């Protein structure tokens, strides 16, 4: 029996923060498929929030909620200030990135390399929790390099939990900090789901969320028999229509499953609004390219959006043109 939860701290399903993917346009698009799944920003560094363009980095549409802000950093006080800003901006959760293995992130001493510094992570969590009233959570790997035993994982979680963190999102792969690219670190290290299941058994008072290699609703349901929540990553971007049925199948809501055409119709007012605010059409439509993934003539959809959205004159009507091309491929002028 699938658990049903209400607030963001115990939401049973989420979409992972993904650089260059989970921006406000993708989140708005995904919200047309699922009203309840917890969505995340891309990772935003503390320095960027404190010294950058906050409107550009943090603004989102109310329809995107519930939405969590993922932070990157290693300074407890700076992260606390960013958490306060995120709460004031209207985010439902603050998440600390302890999972990204990229060289650029490591050079700033945050991301996955922080798994070797659980006391520092605990200090960061404690400072952020004191600064805000919304949940503060941690996303991390199952281990790093040769610190990848189950005992190492328990040691990390225990220290951070003692600082007050109650929700842990565990990517069920270790990360190699040297020798593998971030993309390779998402596929080469083997998945160890059993370790995450065992973590829930050993820490029943904590909310444990599993992440890694999850691509189907049936897998989500299977994992929910072992842990509190499931986070879906690349599959949400490569096959977003997967989420059209989760409100029914995971949250047991009675809302109708939208068709792909209905989703496009729902996007049109948003596209018009964002264009009025100066956004470019391809900033939005690039997230829609995989909507027809696996469907007949899907290539006509992708080709229309990819070939045309760079045109300065392109407007919302291009989505309708692409939809017609997907249905009737002969309508396009070469």
UniProtKB/Swiss-Prot annotation:
UniProt-annotated catalytic positions: 100
Enzyme class: oxidoreductase
Residues where FMN binds: 17-19, 70, 139, 171, 211-213, 233-234
Cofactor(s) the protein needs: FMN
Record keywords, A-Z: Flavoprotein, FMN, NADP, Oxidoreductase, RNA-binding, tRNA processing, tRNA-binding
Residues annotated as signal peptide: none
Entries under CDD domains matching the protein: DUS_like_FMN
Source domain of life: Bacteria
Gene3D superfamilies: 1.20.120.1460, Aldolase class I (3.20.20.70)
Annotated site residue numbers, Interacts with tRNA: 97, 183, 186, 302
Enzyme Commission number(s) from the entry: 1.3.1.-, 1.3.1.91
General function of this protein: Catalyzes the synthesis of 5,6-dihydrouridine (D), a modified base found in the D-loop of most tRNAs, via the reduction of the C5-C6 double bond in target uridines. Specifically modifies U20 and U20a in tRNAs.
HAMAP family: DusA_subfam
Family: Belongs to the Dus family. DusA subfamily.
The protein, known as: tRNA-dihydrouridine(20/20a) synthase
Organism (species): Synechocystis sp. (strain ATCC 27184 / PCC 6803 / Kazusa)
